[in-house]
């Protein structure tokens, strides 16, 4: 059986995802589709709008098998996110991967990926020089890549899907994976569009309009039914209390000493000394109920996750990195946790249909890592994912007053 891999978040599943799925099957001639999906936290450094099991119901729209991208990869840079997804696809024996891109040109994307792989030291050194002089990371990368290639090629890295596409290709090149890449030109609105402009609305715009009457036009029928029957939507600022509690815990463990606090939070990816210092001041302000200047919520003047991220971001460390850093702090996922999957890889199954079940049986004897459908025997291995799910479920329960069943109770979705 030939499997095509899709790296997804389905946050929520919409017309563009269905187009991507159908086009992937058509281009690759695959027998089944395998979606590697972020769990309850997503790459932009936010809570998913619905829990991972509900989002795994993309199975009703034609996906055959959904497996979880471990949380340490799900809330990391584009490079680590892509590397983690390709590891999972390699372990699950995917023959190909199909990803969206603004370019739609696999040859140009592959050429750029090879250049970046061949010049990693130069990239790191040049970008470091630029950022040290106050240039933003994005601008520094753009200038460096332009030196190595040309203006038009470097311009591809200004688009979100192109960036991820290149990272998928880099992961394949570096690891010599036997996974054939295909790209599908993105259709409809831009990834970051907050307004709905076409039938292919962005997930960003849809999350902001989940309760609008006309949203069904932009979501496949079966996905729309699931979305309308699960209205306990979660938004980025819903993590505020959990983050606040975590920061207080770090303050307490640091005996309220600034230097010790800074040392403790610098153990997390993307937290440098300047960011750590800003976090310390903000955390101390919270204790006295003094909202950090510039960190007031637009809604009620109170401290919030989003406003704090805006407050502590710098030119060198953009907002997306700050959000991921604060989510990782909330979840307790420091730099050491990134090594965990490399040492103890696994495939965590979230759901499957009949074809997906057949594929699991097909690969079970040859797969080289644990293929997990029941977590009881793999608690230690899955600890980070379980912890992330528990925090997410506590947030849902606190907001809506409903009991959410955790990973120990819920098994894979079957359709």
Task: Describe these PLM feature segments.
Residues 46-57, 80-83:
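Glycine-rich loop at the start of a catalytic domain that most often binds anionic cofactors/ligands
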Residues 28-31, 63, 94:
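Short, high-confidence coil segments that cap the C-terminus of an alpha-helix
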Residues 6-7, 36-38, 67-70, 182-184:
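Short beta-strands and strand-loop turn motifs
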Residues 69-415:
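Active-site cores that bind ATP or allylic diphosphates and position pyrophosphate for catalysis
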Residues 21-22, 56, 86:
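Generic structural signal for well-ordered alpha-helices
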Residues 1-52:
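N-terminal catalytic cores of NTP/NDP-binding nucleotidyl/phosphoryl-transfer enzymes
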């Amino acid at each position: 059986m030939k499997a095509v891999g899709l790296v997804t978040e389905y946050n929520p599943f919409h017309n563009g995802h269905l187009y991507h799925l159908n086009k992937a099957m058509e281009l690759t001639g695959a027998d089944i589709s395998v979606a590697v999906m972020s769990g309850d936290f997503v790459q932009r450094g936010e809570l998913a709008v619905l829990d991972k099991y509900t989002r795994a119901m993309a199975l009703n729209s034609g996906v055959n098998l959904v497996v979880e991208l471990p949380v340490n990869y799900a809330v990391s840079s584009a490079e680590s996110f892509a590397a983690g997804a390709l590891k999972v696809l390699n372990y699950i024996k995917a023959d190909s991967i199909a990803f969206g891109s603004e370019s739609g040109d696999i040859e140009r994307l592959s050429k750029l990926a090879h250049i970046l792989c061949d010049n990693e030291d130069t990239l790191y050194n040049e970008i470091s020089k630029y950022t040290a002089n106050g240039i933003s990371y994005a601008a520094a990368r753009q200038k460096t890549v332009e030196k190595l290639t040309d203006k038009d090629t470097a311009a591809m890295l200004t688009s979100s899907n192109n960036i991820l596409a290149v990272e998928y290709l880099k992961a394949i090149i570096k690891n010599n994976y036997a996974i054939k890449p295909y790209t599908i030109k993105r259709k409809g609105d831009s990834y970051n569009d907050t307004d709905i402009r076409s039938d292919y609305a962005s997930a960003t715009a849809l999350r902001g309009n989940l309760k609008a009457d006309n949203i069904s036009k932009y979501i496949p029928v079966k996905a729309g039914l699931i979305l309308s029957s699960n209205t306990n939507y979660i938004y980025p600022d819903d993590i505020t209390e959990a983050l606040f509690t975590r920061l207080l815990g770090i303050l307490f463990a640091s005996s309220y000493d600034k230097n010790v606090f800074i040392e403790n939070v610098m153990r997390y990816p993307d937290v440098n000394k300047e960011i750590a210092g800003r976090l310390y001041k903000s955390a101390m302000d919270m204790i006295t109920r003094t909202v950090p200047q510039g960190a007031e919520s637009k809604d009620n003047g109170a401290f919030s996750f989003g406003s704090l991220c805006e407050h502590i971001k710098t030119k060198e460390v953009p907002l997306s990195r700050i959000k991921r850093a604060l989510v990782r702090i909330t979840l307790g996922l420091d730099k050491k946790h990134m090594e965990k999957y490399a040492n103890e890889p696994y495939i965590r199954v979230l759901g499957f249909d009949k074809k997906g079940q057949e594929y699991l049986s097909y690969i079970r004897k040859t797969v080289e890592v644990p293929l997990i459908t029941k977590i009881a025997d793999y608690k230690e291995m899955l600890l980070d994912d379980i912890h992330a799910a528990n925090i997410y479920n506590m947030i849902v329960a606190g907001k809506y007053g409903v009991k959410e069943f955790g990973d120990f109770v819920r098994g894979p979705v079957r359709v």
